[in-house]
Structure formats: C-alpha cells, structure tokens
Swiss-Prot record:
Protein name (database record): BH3-interacting domain death agonist
Motif (BH3): 87-100
Function: Induces caspases and apoptosis. Counters the protective effect of BCL2.
Chain intervals with Polar residues compositional bias: 58-69
Name of the gene encoding the protein in the UniProt record: Bid
Residues modified to N-acetylmethionine: M1
Region Disordered, residue ranges: 58-77
Keyword Membrane: yes
InterPro entries noted in UniProt: Bcl-2-like_sf, Bcl2_BH3_motif_CS, BID
Phosphoserine found at: S78
Residues flagged as site, Cleavage: D59, G60, D75, S76, D98, H99
Keywords: Acetylation, Apoptosis, Cytoplasm, Membrane, Mitochondrion, Mitochondrion outer membrane, Phosphoprotein, Ubl conjugation
Record's keyword annotation contains Chaperone: no
C-alpha cells in the first residue's frame, strides 16, 4: 500500500495503522516495557494513558507526550486522538471476544513467528491462516471487516503476551497485514469518527 495515502491532510496510511495497532495493544494490557521500546521506534507520536491522567493543557484537552520528536502535521494531533479512541473502543470489544482464541492456536502462531527463516510474507500468511481458524467465532451481528480487524489485533496481543520478545515482529506483521487487507475499512472508520 502506498504510504503517502492519507485521510486528507494528516497522517499517512502506515502511520494510521501503526497508531491503531499500538493503541489497541496498549489498551489491551500488553507489557509496558516492550510497548515503550516499540513506541520509541514509531515515526509518529504515541502516548501513555497512565502518564496523562489528570494532565490537561490550558485549553482543557488532554496532554500528549511524544516518544519520537519527528515532525507531525498540525491537524494530525486530533487525528491521533481519534485513532487512539478507536483503538481503545476496539480493545474493549476484543476483551469480549478474547475467549474465542484457543491457547494452542496462540502457541502455534508464536512458534511460527519465532522461526527466523520465515519471510514477512510467510508471517502474514501464518496470521491469515490463524484468522481463518477463528473466523467461525466472529460475532454474527458484527460487520465482517470489523471482526477481522479486532481478531487480527487480538491475535497480535495474545502472541505478544505469550512471548513478549516477539512484540516488535508481531506488531509490524499485523500492521502490514491490516494495510494489505483491511486498510479501506480502517480509513473509513477514522473518517467517520472525524466527521
């Protein structure tokens, strides 16, 4: 996917997905230490909810701290907040779907990610195969793309929780998978929230 695609001005495609997956993992209780390291590697701002509680700016909005001091377009801060709120909401739904993922599936997926000889494409295929296995557990009343997005990020969370050293690889594979298969849905989700 072209990284220059964006939702009007603001964040590019991969940055939207970076923030969405990072926010989901953060809201889902992944280990803080690994997330802090990952957050520093992101080319966009990421912030910790716990660090920001009770910290307001003069205009009354919540403050945000940057792990990376890269240049951000002026209107992207509000877009980042919207993406973070979407991620938090999806994580809450994911908590309700969590029981649908069997521990054996998580262990198998973690073992596949530990295989150093697998290419990024092979890892995405392993993730797709795992998603096919849990597809029957998608809530019937939920839009398929939404369920697929949540389950993709939920699998990433469970693998990272099972083997924290895999967080970086699982994160990047998940972002790439979403950008290839679900980005139109993600873009529309962000656009709808911004309206």
């Amino acid at each position: 996917m072209d990284s220059e695609v964006s939702n009007g001005s603001g964040l590019g495609a991969e940055h939207i997905t970076d923030l969405l997956v990072f926010g989901f993992l953060q809201s889902s209780g992944c280990t803080r230490q690994e997330l802090e390291v990952l957050g520093r590697e992101l080319p966009v701002q990421a912030y910790w909810e716990a660090d920001l509680e009770d910290e307001l700016q003069t205009d009354g909005s919540q403050a945000s701290r940057s792990f990376n001091q890269g240049r951000i377009e002026p209107d992207s801060e509000s877009q980042e907040e919207i993406i973070h709120n979407i991620a938090r909401h999806l994580a809450q739904i994911g908590d309700e779907m969590d029981h649908n993922i069997q521990p054996t599936l998580v262990r198998q997926l973690a073992a596949q990610f530990m295989n150093g000889s697998l290419s990024e494409e092979d890892k995405r295929n392993c993730l797709a195969k795992a998603l096919d296995e849990v597809k029957t557990a998608f809530p019937r009343d939920m839009e398929n793309d939404k369920a697929m997005l949540i389950m993709t990020m939920l699998l990433a969370k469970k693998v990272a929780s099972h083997a924290p050293s895999l967080l970086r690889d699982v994160f990047h594979t998940t972002v790439n998978f979403i950008n290839q298969n679900l980005f139109s849905y993600v873009r529309n989700l962000v656009r709808n929230e911004m309206d």
